[in-house]
């Protein structure tokens, strides 16, 4: 009987110990769970705080950048205006020397002149026409430098400009010559302008050998014509 009572008391003690241990285990688990949940809540709060703080930081950076750009632009504008140099505006420039036979290079824009005096080669006396023809011949001879450089557009421009004056002036001179001298001078003039046309074609074709050939013929024809002019 005594042994049975003792065994029952031992079982009760063991069961209480087991219950207390289970309670302790459950309590520790609950504490750990609560700690974990609290930690996760704190972590979430920290992340939200960081997100809220990053927005004003970026806005502050953008504002600082705009202010710096404004200051730099203002200093640049000040420097530009500081370097501005005033330009004095006066009256029109004096008439400059123009082509032979014109009073000045602005003659075509002189609205006080008649159209025939502004846009056409002005007629000269035979003596003045002969002098201008010699000047035009010199300019034609000077195209040799452009031929050597193969500057073909310049060769064509000078040839056509000077040849137009030369043809006009030679016709003036021929018309004043005696009848027995007119035909020979006309023949020399026709040969001269044929060689000038050949030289112009060589320049248009960009052929150096042909340009050299017809340039020599042009110079020879010019000398023959100028010798007749006196």
From Swiss-Prot:
Gene Ontology annotations of biological process type: photosynthesis
Pfam families assigned to the protein according to its UniProt record, in alphabetical order: PsbQ
Annotated membrane topology: Peripheral membrane protein
Subcellular compartments: Plastid, Chloroplast thylakoid membrane
Residues with the Phosphotyrosine modification: 215
First and last residue of the signal peptide: none
Keywords: Chloroplast, Membrane, Phosphoprotein, Photosynthesis, Photosystem II, Plastid, Thylakoid, Transit peptide
Modified residues (Phosphoserine): 125, 216
GO cellular component, one term: thylakoid
Interval spanned by the transit peptide: 1-49, 50-82
Sites of Phosphothreonine modification: 195, 218
Function: Required for photosystem II assembly/stability and photoautotrophic growth under low light conditions.
Family that this chain belongs to: Belongs to the PsbQ family.
Protein name as it appears in the record: Oxygen-evolving enhancer protein 3-2, chloroplastic
Source organism: Arabidopsis thaliana
Lineage, uppermost ranks: Eukaryota, Viridiplantae, Streptophyta, Embryophyta, Tracheophyta
